[in-house]
């Protein structure tokens, strides 16, 4: 754990991270990730704060904010089956965000399969704006040995949806192998933010 107070920089920071030896119930279930709280009263980030478990939304980047590893879990059920997951939550002076992702994979040599799903969402306060996305994918394959050589057969299916507002609109995508079908929905107008302060939002 790290705690830092600097009157010259106008910064108060608390940050912690799980070690490489962190596990849940038994050693095969590994845990990763970190936590941070910071507030500034001087400098370019004066008046801002951040509280995060596991980091930030993929599109959210701010200079000077603490870098925090995703909260994650990796469970090696057996030599062939692995379950991995990650998540984050963050509240800052300008936005609220959260997300999760999970992947289950199995590899038996002659056959394999993977299932993955996840979601991300972020809401900005001023101007008011939100965006969110969710996805799911499944893929599988087999290897067949013949007198002519090894034949590999695989298939993959996926779906993804993205939305944003306040002029609600979005896009849905269906993926079948290398092909995809995209459908747009909602407003076609340019999104204009509605100014909402932190006090009004909460």
Task: Enumerate the predicted regions with their spans.
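Extended assembly/interaction regions that build large supramolecular complexes
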Residues: 1-202
């Amino acid at each position: 754990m790290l705690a830092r107070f600097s009157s010259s920089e106008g910064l108060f920071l608390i940050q912690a991270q799980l070690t490489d030896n962190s596990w849940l119930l038994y050693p095969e279930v590994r845990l990763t990730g970190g936590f941070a709280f910071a507030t500034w009263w001087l400098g370019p980030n004066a008046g801002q704060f951040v509280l995060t478990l596991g980091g930030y939304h993929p599109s959210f980047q701010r200079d000077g904010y603490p870098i925090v590893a995703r909260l994650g879990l990796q469970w090696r059920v057996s030599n062939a089956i692995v379950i991995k997951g990650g998540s984050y939550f963050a509240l800052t002076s300008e936005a609220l965000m959260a997300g999760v992702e999970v992947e289950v994979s199995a590899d038996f040599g002659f056959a394999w399969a993977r299932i993955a799903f996840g979601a991300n969402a972020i809401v900005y306060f001023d101007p008011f704006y939100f965006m969110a996305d969710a996805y799911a994918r499944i893929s599988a394959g087999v290897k067949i040995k013949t007198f002519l050589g090894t034949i590999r057969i695989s298939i993959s299916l996926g779906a993804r949806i993205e939305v944003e507002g306040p002029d609600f609109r979005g896009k849905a995508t269906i993926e079948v192998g290398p092909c995809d079908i995209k459908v747009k929905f909602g407003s076609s107008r340019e999104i204009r933010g509605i100014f909402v302060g932190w006090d009004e939002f909460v």
